[in-house]
Amino acid sequence: GRRAERLKALQDELGADRFHPCVFDVRDEDVRDKALDGLPEAFGQIDCLVNNAGLALGTEAAQESDLDNWKVMIDTNITALVSLTRKLLPMLVERKGAIVNLSSVAATYPYPGGNVYGGTKAFVHQFTLGLRSDLHGTGVRVTSIEPGMVETEFTVVRTGGSQQAS
């Protein structure tokens, strides 16, 4: 995650022996790998990967959208998810773990301005199905959660910080 103060509060609540926060941008593979490789021994064996990092930027029609926003969504919602999953797959197979990918109903229900975001979530859905097929028989469980509209900070980010628009 990237919300250090919230993660620290959760660690305080759960205890440092039960929760070790890692704060980094999932798009930065070097920083991510250092964080994972530097985990304390008690947290070095991962049983469950929850790919929850994701974002949607902008609400404009495709022809008016900012290409840089599209690239950030693809890098976060697809590239980082695939890269992190691949890095942890050997350990998850060894431990018969679980992978939970956060997709969205936007994967199958298009809406104006949701072009690239919906495309990234369609990828997550299909990637989950492919992983489940590849990992069949290994004991690794793979699932995708595809929520609809949920009142979170996510929509505030999408609308550029406008609580009212979200």
Each model region followed by its residue ranges:
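The beta1-alpha1 cofactor-binding region of Rossmann-like NAD(H)/NADP(H)-dependent oxidoreductases
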Residues: E5, V23-K34, L67
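Active-site loop immediately N-terminal to the catalytic Tyr-X3-Lys motif
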Residues: Y111-N115
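Residue(s) in the substrate-gating loop at a strand-loop-helix junction
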Residues: S104
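Active-site helix of classical SDR
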Residues: T85, T120
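Substrate-binding pocket helix/loop in short-chain dehydrogenase/reductase
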Residues: E60-A62, D66-K71
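SDR active-site lid
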Residues: Q126, R132-S166
